[in-house]
Regions:
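N-terminal signal peptide c-region/cleavage motif recognized by signal peptidases
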Residues: 13-17
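Bacterial N-terminal signal peptides that target proteins for export
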Residues: 1-8
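Charge-rich (acidic/polar
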Residues: 21-177
């Protein structure tokens, strides 16, 4: 009986210690603390990283996903070419902005790591990072607007269904053109 009580005590202490651990534990080894390796890769590749969810989830498809679904959406050759061009332009615009964001986050991280950060430097760095994040988000969102102008109403509905966004809400089915 004493062995069972000891085992229960050990388990209780272990679970308490595990619960006390920060959700950030393990992140201290990142090269840039604020960005995961996946986020860095996505920024380098010009990927959206959910930055255009306001558009995507409100009926404005993104060019990449439209291209992925081009056969099921029955895009015409002209539509496909226009959307391919949008996608390439978006990626070409977003990639250097993403690289800039990586550099800015790295510089901020270094200042904290070197303990050289000041209030003024912090304000300047975070302002620049915020501006760059806004540029990056805009670089993705605006291509959702343009993509919606290319698709027909039935293709917009089909896209929403294929992506799992279809709803009976009348607001979902109005034309975005």
């Amino acid at each position: 009986m004493k062995a069972i009580a000891t085992a229960i005590t050990v388990l209780a202490l272990a679970s308490t210690a595990a619960m006390a651990q920060s959700p950030y534990a393990g992140m201290q080894g990142r090269s840039i603390k604020a960005l995961s390796a996946q986020q860095i890769d996505d920024l380098k590749a010009g990927k959206g990283m959910g930055l255009a969810l306001a558009a995507e989830l409100n009926g404005y498809p993104g060019p990449m996903h439209v291209l992925e679904l081009s056969d099921k959406l029955a895009l015409s050759a002209a539509q496909k070419q226009r959307i391919q061009t949008l996608f390439e332009t978006m990626k070409a615009e977003a990639t250097p902005i993403g690289l800039s964001l990586i550099g800015q986050e790295s510089a901020l991280d270094r200042q904290f790591a070197n303990r050289s950060i000041t209030s003024d430097a912090l304000r300047e760095a975070t302002t620049k990072i915020g501006q760059t994040q806004a540029e990056l988000r805009n670089a993705h969102l605006k291509y959702h607007l343009e993509t919606a102008q290319i698709l027909l109403p039935d293709q917009m509905k089909q896209y929403a269904q294929l992506r799992g966004y279809a709803s009976d809400s009348p607001a979902r089915h109005h034309r975005m053109h």
